[in-house]
Amino acid sequence: MTDIKKSEPAEDYPPEEGCYLRGNDYSPVAVVVILRWRREQTPADIENLVRVGVESGAALAGTLQTENIGIEKIICNVVSNPNIRYLVVCGPESPGHLVGDTLLALAKNGIDDRKRIVGTDAPTPFLFNVQPEFVKRFRDQITVIDLINEGSPEVLRQAVWSCYQEKPTLFGKYEFYDSGAYPAEPLSGKITWKITQPSLEPKSDEERAHRENIQTLIGRIRKAAEKREHSN
């Protein structure tokens, strides 16, 4: 039997709360089910996909709504468990947030110097609240399995099963096997919450400079008003 090396997750694993279920900590796969509805309107078939993910052997399985803070939470939870080497993304794509497309782009391209995920058409794909080290580890540690717009429990079950086989196993266009834990200590930490509304942040250097100029002008006006008030 092949010796597959496993390691202990961080003590606070999984550090971020969310709408997910926890399964086998030593499993090499986690499942993300795209949620395009309001949380309180989650359809039964989406909830079932989450359950199927964990029941099939995933370490974590849960829903994802947003292309920024939601992904930041996933990053923190994944890098705190080196055993997770695959991330299955399934369910109908969100036409607004494009969270599935954003996860694929993150894995392929990373982020730019403004912390924007490169190569996605999502409206606000910014990772302001996680360290660049966490983003790099996430990309190095996991392979994203694209099952976007796939809602079959049987297909998801087969994908998860394929990920924890000892020998390379074909699944569609992919070939999976459990290669063991990522060869580094887990990274432990939560998102900083420095920016809670990424959609309100400047989208370019020009927009940021314009806002800074406005703030400077407002500051000057306030100082002038205070000076006039004290002189009266």
Write out the residue ranges for each language-model feature.
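Divalent-metal-activated hydrolytic enzyme cores
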Residues: G110-K194
